[in-house]
Regions:
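Function-determining surface determinants
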Residues: 1-286
Length: 286
């Protein structure tokens, strides 16, 4: 359950119910074997992102935002090493699929999965932090009327993502794309949470936002891979292989940036005030 319902319970109690459901699912995921192709680490981090997306939507009316957002951020950070390990393999695999050259095949062949017991301590730390958040979630409450909070939250998440897209376009720096990636993800969570107000219309929005998130996510992963290679943390035989890998990454980054800006023009075409009016009109007329 990751949806506000315009015909459902009051927004204040719905906020708590969604949060508690996500927290309980996150804790349950830790005890489940990996049967979906997604790792426990992937699922744990996905839940924390959804929770933080929820908090950002209600931030204008939630006094506990800073404390709980920081707690969830720290929980996710406890898994960052495991996440980086997994993503490195997936990034190499995706790059090899895009351009199947022998260098990438060799790097993939030399990349091994660490033993599962290496995950135990970080996962235990993650669980401990999530249990602490879960213990407080039942007392979370909004300090502003629900509709007022949602309206301010929609405006804030959209405006932030739109501004960061423009920064990425103007400055073309990896950190600017990283900031845009995070804020676009948050805006996607906002629209997903409000989707029941106009399932068909907002469903189309979510689809394009997801495509943009995928392009920006691949971009970020490749930037990290490029830094990892430059720091000597990949089994490259010498400068020639480093230059070859760097050139491949640079070419792919250029393609992803072009794709991201094209999708961004669709997602962020409206001014923040107009977008907010449109979304809230769906909610009020549902």
């Amino acid at each position: 359950m990751y949806k506000f319902d315009p015909h459902g319970e009051p927004l204040d109690s719905a906020f708590r119910a969604i949060a508690i459901d996500q927290l309980d699912e996150a804790l349950s995921d830790l005890a489940q074997p990996d049967t979906s192709g997604r790792s426990i680490v992937h699922e744990a981090r996905r839940r924390t992102k959804k929770l933080r997306g929820l908090l950002r939507l209600v931030r204008p009316g939630f006094p506990g935002f800073d404390r709980e957002n920081d707690a969830l951020r720290d929980a996710a950070a406890s898994l960052s090493h495991l996440r980086d390990r997994e993503v490195r393999r997936e990034t190499l695999r995706a790059l090899a699929k895009w351009r199947p050259v022998s260098l990438l095949e060799r790097l993939l062949a030399g990349s091994t999965e660490p033993a599962a017991h290496d995950d135990a301590a970080p996962l235990a730390a993650f669980r401990e932090r999530m249990v602490e958040v879960r213990a407080r979630a039942g007392q979370w409450a909004l300090s502003r009327p629900g509709l007022e909070t949602l309206e301010a939250g929609v405006r804030r998440t959209y405006r932030t993502a739109r501004r960061r897209m423009r920064k990425a376009r103007d400055l073309h720096e990896p950190t600017r794309f990283h900031d845009w990636r995070k804020s676009n993800k948050n805006y996607g969570f906002t629209i997903d949470l409000l989707r029941k107000a106009a399932p068909d219309l907002l469903g189309d929005d979510v689809e394009v936002i997801d495509k943009l998130s995928n392009a920006l996510g691949q971009h970020h992963d490749l930037v990290v891979l490029r830094v990892t290679a430059a720091q000597g943390h990949l089994p490259l035989s010498g400068p020639e292989q480093l230059m070859e890998l760097d050139a491949l990454i640079g070419e792919r980054l250029g393609e992803l940036e072009a794709e991201a800006f094209e999708l961004g023009r669709q997602v962020y075409a409206e001014r923040p005030a107009a977008l907010t009016r449109r979304i809230m009109s769906y909610w009020k007329s549902a």
